[in-house]
């Protein structure tokens, strides 16, 4: 029996290694940089690079070869071309050779085929700006004799597409011709020389005269160039040089004529928050910014006072989020509503923080006092609303109510949160300065800003570890959650809620603790050179709590640049550029989700959140242009790689050329701000120390930094994190993950008189108290789910486990058993919920080397990398040993298995033994044996996806708690520490060494 178990264990271990060390396959470079173009030869991606044209949802989908589709809901069309020469007709997407180029809103092709001899066809495509249409330019050269072009246009294979038919959401084949070529239209023309084809959204195809076609094409291209040539980067790095035109085109794709949208394609809906609104100022569209801000300030509630006290949780959503009711704290004066120009449409987000941060950034570019005065009432309303709702206890630290992109499944239970506190610090600091400029008393806002910063440093900054905590609990033990997400690093840095030394140290936390994932490239010397990052190291996975998201990577790169860590920032920037724009399916794409995300993989194109923060990462970060018009200054704080000796940037508001000599850094600057600003160059000398070289406020100037006069950089203490994963055997033993000792003696302990529940009661209960006294996002009523999905439920059923019990003993198959009943209560639960005691003492006698514990309970992503509970062994001499129950090391959620990949999702080298409650099966690798399903109960066969691995009927777990064999036991105490969770013991068996 032992041999059979050993063989099974070894086989499962091999399977576990295969599952938990899963790098995604390396990709070949799809695209390469050449000047401002992104180029591919004989590429295979279809309908992946969108050209946007005007400011509607219409777009032209282009491919790596000249086959196209238009998207316009139910009017979407497939458009394909044919060339006929010497009696041979070829579809243009099937030739021997095709070079495709993309540059900000334009896609061009050089097409050749051996059957044409030395002839070549140039195809240029544009989406029109003046209507929902497109134009193609054809230039045929080297053809001997007649050459004709023809076009077929028909309905696409699928019309109704999820998320607008975006990448990663629907198959690209949806844009192929419909099977019956429904609505087929054709056109043929003489293709000699230069010819054109025009598509208009009234479903017409037109072959105009060359003169008319050239006029339309030139006008369209000039309009495109006015958009994409506003920003230019010239650097030693060819990848960076492509970004100016492409980011402008992507940003323009997210503009609807009045406001910035959530995305250009998949999320093409109005959105006041997130980071899309940074694009306008960073890329030099101040008129668009004012349009955006004007539209949404009309969405701010101004005539609904708060009349209902906090909390105001929604019973229909099982108390997980705020009730949508006018006059509650959230839905009252100061609240920013969902749609532009309307202050009567509720949303479930706090969009205020991001929206007003973008407004404050606008004032850094342009301190127009007339516009300041116009916006000032809304700024005051916003800050009053934030204070009233999210700092209701007045301690100057703020709760976070889904106020950043990573908001789904993110909830803080009324706690004190780093990122929201940082935003409010900045908001109050800017309000104080604006008040001063407008002749008002700045004191109230300055005092609040000072108090927030003091509280953040005193309560959220981890001095010994050199970074901010994610949050501080309001309830229960009021503990700090130290495993911070990247947003809890980059937000306080971006909001200047820190010293430059703190910023440097906080980015070192990212180096140590945030998962890094290598960018794998086939047949390239860049293979593995760069690494991208996940947003957190939290488990179990839920959407937006542990992802590889382009916008989060870019914002983290910006934080590195701001902290003065230029090399690390550039490496992260390059990782993201390669991942999304050159290895991905869409050239020059500013997408949302990375290929390396184990739940979604590559998804979405030109997502506004990424476009906005990427524009800032490049302009405010890499090139370091930091206007501060509120104080009449503009800082240039470059973060170039050390090998760059020259580069330049051109934007509508400021351009400069940089070059380095043996001893000097020279900046040739030309500014075009609305108000002339004093130029100041900030040079990093390491570890958060910068030296300023002052210029003047003239339009054109040269600033020279003499590096021989720079002081040596300051050295600070290097902080080591205590949470770096320990893979030693001693650590595994300490965390209860050891195997049974061969030939050990086991003594089962009857703890049935302490049982207070059935194990499957856990999600049948209503957990009503204690709950926060303030409106917040919190655990749903039944102790499972999250605010986006409060209705989530699973079946926990222990019939199979009980059926395996023989004479009150459950045989683990590992050489020992637990006493457990076949009917009635079979667990003692503890919790900070009032439903159960927060701790339980179980008397014990004798001596033992270890205590085997059969346990079950709950945990979630907001309780990850923190002790959820303690098991304390008390000895008769007054001493004790403690087993810490930490998610995900040795504490598992009853309803699911952890997905582990050795990258973004890591735990200890060994998993805890799990006991399937539906069958009694025992294994460290339960999911491959009993199967998994999704939240909806549908069977899942893909063990390589991070999506939740729900175990039907649930699973308990077993831990081996080490004890001191020389000491006599008095009692075992189970104590729950984390809010929201339930922890229970089903059985105890003592292990003693063999004589």
Q: Model features per residue range: what roles?
A:
Residues 222-374, 480-498, 528-563, 567-574, ...:
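Substrate-binding groove/exosite segments of carbohydrate-active enzymes
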Residues 18-30, 101, 116-122, 127-267, ...:
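Acidic/polar, glycine-enriched structural segments that form the non-catalytic walls/loops
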């Amino acid at each position: 029996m032992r041999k059979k178990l050993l063989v099974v264990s070894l086989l499962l271990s091999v399977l576990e290694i295969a599952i938990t060390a899963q790098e995604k396959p390396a990709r070949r470079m799809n695209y390469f940089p050449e000047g401002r173009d992104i180029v591919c030869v004989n590429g295979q991606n279809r309908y992946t690079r969108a050209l946007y044209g005007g400011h509607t949802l219409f777009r032209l989908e282009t491919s790596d070869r000249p086959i196209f589709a238009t998207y316009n809901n139910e009017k979407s069309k497939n458009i394909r071309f044919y060339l006929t020469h010497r009696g041979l007709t070829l579809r243009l997407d099937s030739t021997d050779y095709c070079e495709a180029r993309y540059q900000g809103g334009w896609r061009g092709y050089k097409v050749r085929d051996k059957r044409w001899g030395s002839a070549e066809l140039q195809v240029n495509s544009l989406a029109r700006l003046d209507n929902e249409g497109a134009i193609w330019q054809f230039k045929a050269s080297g053809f001997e004799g007649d050459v004709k072009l023809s076009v077929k246009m028909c309905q696409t294979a699928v019309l109704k597409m999820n998320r607008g038919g975006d990448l990663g959401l629907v198959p690209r084949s949806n844009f192929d011709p419909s099977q019956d070529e429904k609505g087929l239209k054709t056109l043929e023309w003489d293709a000699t020389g230069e010819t054109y084809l025009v598509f208009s959204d009234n479903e017409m195809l037109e072959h105009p005269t060359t003169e008319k076609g050239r006029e339309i094409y030139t006008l369209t291209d000039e309009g495109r160039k006015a958009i994409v040539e506003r920003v230019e980067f010239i650097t030693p790095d060819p990848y960076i040089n492509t970004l100016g035109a492409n980011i402008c085109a992507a940003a323009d794709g997210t503009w609807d004529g009045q406001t910035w949208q959530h995305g250009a394609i998949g999320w093409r809906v109005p959105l006041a928050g997130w980071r899309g609104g940074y694009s306008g100022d960073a890329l030099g569209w101040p008129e668009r910014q004012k349009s955006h801000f004007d539209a949404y300030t009309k969405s701010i509630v101004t005539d609904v006072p708060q009349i209902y006290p906090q909390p105001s949780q929604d019973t229909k959503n099982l108390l997980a989020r705020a009730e949508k009711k006018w006059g509650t704290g959230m839905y009252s004066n100061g609240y920013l509503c969902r749609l532009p120009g309307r202050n009567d449409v509720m949303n479930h987000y706090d969009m205020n923080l991001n929206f007003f941060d973008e407004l404050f950034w606008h004032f850094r570019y342009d301190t127009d006092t007339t516009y300041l005065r116009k916006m000032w009432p809304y700024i005051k309303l916003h800050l009053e609303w934030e204070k009233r709702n999210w700092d209701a206890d007045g301690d100057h630290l703020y709760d976070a109510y889904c106020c950043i992109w990573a908001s789904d499944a993110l909830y803080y239970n009324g706690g004190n949160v780093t990122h929201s506190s940082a935003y409010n610090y900045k908001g109050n600091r800017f309000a104080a300065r604006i008040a001063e400029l407008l002749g008002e008393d700045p004191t109230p806002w300055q005092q609040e800003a000072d108090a927030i910063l003091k509280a953040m440093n005193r309560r959220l900054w981890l001095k010994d570890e050199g970074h901010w905590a994610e949050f501080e609990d309001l309830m229960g033990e009021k503990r700090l959650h130290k495993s911070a997400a990247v947003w809890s690093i980059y937000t306080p840095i971006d909001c200047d809620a820190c010293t430059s030394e703190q910023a440097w140290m906080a980015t070192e936390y990212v180096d140590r603790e945030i998962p890094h994932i290598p960018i794998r490239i086939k047949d390239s010397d860049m293979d593995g050179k760069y690494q991208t990052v996940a947003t957190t190291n939290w488990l179990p996975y839920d959407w937006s709590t542990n992802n590889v998201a382009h916008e989060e990577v870019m914002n983290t790169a910006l934080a590195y640049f701001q902290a003065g860590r230029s090399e690390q920032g550039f490496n992260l920037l390059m990782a993201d550029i390669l991942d999304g724009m050159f290895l991905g399916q869409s050239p020059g794409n500013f997408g949302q989700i990375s290929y390396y995300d184990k739940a979604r993989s590559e998804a979405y194109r030109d997502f506004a959140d990424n476009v906005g923060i990427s524009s800032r990462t490049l302009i405010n970060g890499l090139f370091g242009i930091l206007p501060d018009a509120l104080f009449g200054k503009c800082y240039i704080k470059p973060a170039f790689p050390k090998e760059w000796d020259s580069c330049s940037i051109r934007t509508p508001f400021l351009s400069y050329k940089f070059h380095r000599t043996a001893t000097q850094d020279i900046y040739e600057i030309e500014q075009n701000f609305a108000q002339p600003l004093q130029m100041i160059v900030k040079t990093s000398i390491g570890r958060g120390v910068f030296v300023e070289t002052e210029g003047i406020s003239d339009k054109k100037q040269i600033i020279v930094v003499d590096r021989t006069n720079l002081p040596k950089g300051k050295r600070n203490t290097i902080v080591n994190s205590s949470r770096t994963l320990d893979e030693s055997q001693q650590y595994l033993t300490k965390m209860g993950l050891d195997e049974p000792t061969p030939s050990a003696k086991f003594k089962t302990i009857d703890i049935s008189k302490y049982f207070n529940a059935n194990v499957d009661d856990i999600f049948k209960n209503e957990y009503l108290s204690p709950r926060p006294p303030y409106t917040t996002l919190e655990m749903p009523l039944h102790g499972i789910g999250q605010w986006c999905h409060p209705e989530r439920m699973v079946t926990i059923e222990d019939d199979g486990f009980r059926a395996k019990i023989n004479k009150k003993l459950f045989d683990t198959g590992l050489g020992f058993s637990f006493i457990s009943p076949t009917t009635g209560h079979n667990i003692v639960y503890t919790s900070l919920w009032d439903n159960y005691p927060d701790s339980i003492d179980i008397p014990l006698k004798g001596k033992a080397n270890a205590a085997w514990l059969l346990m079950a309970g709950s945990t979630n992503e907001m309780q990850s990398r923190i002790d959820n509970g303690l098991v304390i062994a008390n000895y008769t001499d007054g001493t004790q040993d403690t087993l810490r129950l930490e998610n995900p090391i040795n504490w598992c959620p009853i309803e699911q298995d952890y997905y582990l990949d050795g990258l973004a999702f890591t735990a200890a080298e060994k998993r805890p033994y799990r006991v399937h409650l539906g069958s009694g099966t025992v294994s460290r690798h339960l999911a491959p044996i009993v199967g998994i399903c999704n939240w909806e109960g549908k069977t899942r066969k893909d063990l390589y996806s991070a999506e939740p691995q729900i175990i039907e009927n649930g699973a308990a777990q077993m831990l081996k708690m080490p004890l001191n064999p020389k000491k006599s036991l008095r009692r075992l105490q189970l104590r729950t520490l984390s809010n929201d969770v339930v922890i229970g013991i089903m059985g105890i068996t003592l292990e003693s060494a063999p004589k």
